[in-house]
């Protein structure tokens, strides 16, 4: 957990350092089909938070694992596939599930503060998930019950996915500063 928390804190600091000085107009500026910096960050909050109800269900002992989550080869394959697909290098462009797309019309003024606060919530949920991580609990993706992976893989995916979108936001920043 300490390493995971360090990675989360590192991502928080990175977002604050890179984008904390920008105006709301700059944070919300888009170019073409690219998401704005604020939309990238809102997308991260949306995805990360979508796992919280599953962790709540695990805590309450009401979560039902999908049937195919019993097959380790499926769990390992899908977890590895998703993890690889969100690597920060962004060599392959990926389309997100509609449930995780940021709202286009929303102007986000305090998105950096929201992200910072969200990371505190994320760390709290990781602490709640600790016994389930140790037991190698399998969950489904909040976007699709077909996609299953171990809970510890979820947090690796979250960290990598954040770095991927921070890179995307940095590209947007370069366009803004030109």
Q: What spans do the regions from the language model cover?
A:
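Active-site oxyanion-binding pockets that recognize sulfate/phosphate
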Residues: 1, 34, 104-112, 148, ...
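An N-terminal domain-cap segment
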Residues: 1-9, 13-35
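Serine/threonine-rich low-complexity intrinsically disordered regions
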Residues: 3, 23, 66-69, 87, ...
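General secondary-structure edge motif
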Residues: 7, 20-21, 35, 91, ...
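Acidic/histidine-rich alpha-helical segments that form the ligand environment
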Residues: 11, 18-21, 77-134
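Short, contiguous alpha-helical
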Residues: 30-83, 120-128, 132-178
């Amino acid at each position: 957990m300490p390493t995971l928390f360090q990675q989360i804190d590192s991502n928080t600091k990175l977002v604050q350092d890179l984008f904390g000085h920008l105006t709301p107009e700059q944070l919300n500026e888009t170019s073409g089909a690219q998401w704005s910096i604020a939309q990238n960050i809102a997308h991260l909050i949306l995805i990360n938070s979508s796992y919280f109800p599953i962790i709540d269900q695990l805590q309450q002992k009401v979560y039902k694992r999908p049937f195919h989550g019993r097959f380790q080869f499926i769990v390992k394959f899908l977890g590895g596939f998703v993890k690889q697909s969100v690597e920060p290098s962004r060599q392959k462009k990926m389309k997100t599930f509609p449930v995780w797309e940021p709202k286009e019309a929303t102007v986000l003024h305090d998105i950096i503060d929201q992200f910072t606060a969200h990371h505190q919530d994320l760390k709290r949920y990781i602490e709640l998930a600790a016994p389930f991580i140790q037991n190698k609990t399998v969950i489904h993706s909040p976007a699709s019950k077909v996609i299953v992976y171990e809970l510890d893989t979820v947090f690796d995916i979250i960290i990598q996915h954040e770095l991927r979108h921070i890179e995307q936001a940095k590209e947007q920043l370069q366009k803004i500063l030109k």
